[in-house]
Amino acid sequence: MLLVPRVPVVMQGKCGLLKISRPLQGSLSRGFHFSRAHRSEYDEEKVVIDEINKKLTPVDIQNQQKLRNIGISAHIDSGKTTFTERVLYYTKRIKEIHEVRGRDNVGATMDFMDLEREKGITIQSAATYCSWDKDKNSYHFNLIDTPGHIDFTIEVERALRVLDGAVLVVCAVSGVQSQTVTVDRQMRRYNVPRVTFINKMDRMGANPFKAIEQLNSKLKLPAAAVQVPIGAESELKGVVDLLDMKAYYNKGDNGEIIESGPIPEELKSLAEEKRQVLIETLADVDEHMAEIFLEEKEPTIQEMKDAIRRATIARKFTPVLMGSALANTGVQHVLDAIVDYLPNPSEVLNTGLDIAHEEAKVNLIPSVQQPFVGLAFKLEEGKYGQLTYIRVYQGRLKKGSYITNVKTGKKVKVSRLVRMHSNEMEDVDEVGSGEICATFGIDCSSGDTFSDGTLQYSMSSMFVPDAVVSLSITPKSKDSTNFSKALNRFQKEDPTFRVRFDPESKETVISGMGELHLEIYVERMKREYNVECITGKPQVSYRESITIPSEFDYTHKKQSGGAGQYARIIGDLSPVEGGNKSNVFETHVVGGRIPDKYLSACAKGFDEACERGPLIGHKVLNVKMLINDGAIHSVDSNELAFKVATLTAFRDAFLKAQPVIMEPIMIVSVTSPNEFQGNVIGLLNKLQAVIQETDNGHDEFTLRAECSLSTMFGFASSLRASTQGKGEFSLEFSHYAPTAPHVQKELIAEFQKKQKK
């Protein structure tokens, strides 16, 4: 029987009185049973991981324990590239610090593209490795710095797919912003645990505890500080560690020397209060910590560390550290936290699909004794040819060995194997399980799985979001060789960048995640391929759908001497319930009235019809086609006839089903100084945006609203004018919604006018 004290429990410890609040007592009594009755997803994974680890050799275990694959993610301008620069400096990977935007004519190490250094944003994920010494052990980090801008979200997806943990960088002034929410969603999709670093503590208006509240409320992720700052804004001096209750200060020209001392008198009560909050939060998410409470004990430093590690790896909690990368404060503590709280490769469950056995799910074993399995997660065109980044999940990859592309069955030789440091590389002979490396001369696509040829394992590919913006592009010169070469390379590197030729306008059309995304590629074409282009006005990627069911009974006949064409299909079109953004094709034909080979042709016809809708030629969304009857002719029926019949029946039924044009609805997040709040709200009202929430800070505000993408072109210059250049914004796709009736009429009229031309 479980006994819970009915009065507050007070415990005397070296850090003062530790009192459990009444709400916590309730959560402890509930949580003790709750954690057993409702085991988290990770609890189930842990059972499998423990079984896998029994198969590892002592050497495997030792190698894995010293390895961390870490990503650094954040909202744009939260300071993560500056943070990464300090990490490289403190781990002795670079000898001097350079700043973002190339202010010193050098630029941040990880921003190696000229465009990145000019614009001060990270466009591609740069990979590097470094070592960090802690407790007389050397730990090896594979580190990836990812873009914060929403237009480059595929780079974040690629990084998280192959990482075991992440550092989430949050601005102390702005707190949780729109892209922070997006990154959180991506981390959850790939089950990536994270530690959080609240950066820019030296900025005016810095409020780390408000940011922690937002982590709890907006991200619905239990979070608690493991540090409190010593001073803030321009008076930031260091941090207090809430586990060992000591003060730490960064000294030296670049903060490379760390000194410790007693907690300043004025911070003792705050430190004790926040330490208790940390312990209470841990007791809510960790069974062992809950037991310590119920036994009325004060947790030791090691017990707290262990609880933080367990809860973080289980994705139930994130420890929050704080400091300022630009002011060289607090970064080394984050490196310690990566070692202490984030998982090594043997603590993460990675699975594949065994193609040889009907895609049965298989667990990958992070041992060099196992057959090789790796995932190509990123492609780059380098000066020595195509560079392919590979995460090794099982076995080892050796220079000179042969590996097989599981998708194509093609065998290739690993002629050169390198570890990357930004755009520089270091040759290696071999990499083991859990490592990230790169190789040359392998023809593949992003997301392909490689093996040693004995296994046919495939790993699930990265999530690729739909493109929402398109524009026409034409080279100024008639020589189109480099133009085609550039487009082919960019498509291969970036799955969210798409190219198609419009037969009506005779133009090449590129599509992507936003205006900036496409602008960057147009600029890269000019710089890297010497191809200047003329671009058209950005176009919205609309979708077409229906609102009511519609039946069809269509017969396709064609007779022109000799064998003709005959196909009859009967069925209906209907909207897909739930709006899951997919189209569905089903057949319920009985008695063999339509043979399977003809039904397969119907499915191809349906897919083709969905690529180009009847209203304005855009893709079709949320439509289900059911064929339940039909007829064939013994001589004239063939696959082409049934495909054509499906295309025509689809079009006719679609137009009778009260069709609608759907437009992308975006979440716009605007941050600006407080004095421009009225201007920004007025600007959004003109665009008929629906304001969802406003977050007022010390000297700036953040506003989130829903608006149609079609109204947002040119918003950057309007915002600049309304805020004297001090406002910034980001756009993220939310969902598709029907356009206004008058807009639909205009779009259809415009499309029909083009058709006549």
From Swiss-Prot:
Residues holding GTP: 74-81, 145-149, 199-202
SUPFAM superfamilies in the record: EF-G C-terminal domain-like (SSF54980), P-loop containing nucleoside triphosphate hydrolases (SSF52540), Ribosomal protein S5 domain 2-like (SSF54211), Translation proteins (SSF50447)
Presence of the UniProt keyword Mitochondrion in the record: yes
Pathway involvement of the protein, from the record: Protein biosynthesis; polypeptide chain elongation
Transit peptide: 1-39
Main location: mitochondrion
One of the record's GO molecular function terms: translation elongation factor activity
Pfam families: EFG_C, EFG_III, EFG_IV, GTP_EFTU, GTP_EFTU_D2
tRNA-binding listed as a keyword: no
PROSITE patterns in UniProt: G_TR_1, G_TR_2
A GO biological process held by the record: mitochondrial translational elongation
GO cellular component, one term: mitochondrion
Subcellular location field: Mitochondrion
Ranges for domain tr-type G: 65-346
UniProt keyword annotations, A-Z: Elongation factor, GTP-binding, Mitochondrion, Nucleotide-binding, Protein biosynthesis, Transit peptide
Family from the record: Belongs to the TRAFAC class translation factor GTPase superfamily. Classic translation factor GTPase family. EF-G/EF-2 subfamily.
Function: Mitochondrial GTPase that catalyzes the GTP-dependent ribosomal translocation step during translation elongation. During this step, the ribosome changes from the pre-translocational (PRE) to the post-translocational (POST) state as the newly formed A-site-bound peptidyl-tRNA and P-site-bound deacylated tRNA move to the P and E sites, respectively. Catalyzes the coordinated movement of the two tRNA molecules, the mRNA and conformational changes in the ribosome.
Protein name in the entry: Elongation factor G, mitochondrial
Lineage of the organism: Eukaryota, Fungi, Dikarya, Ascomycota, Saccharomycotina
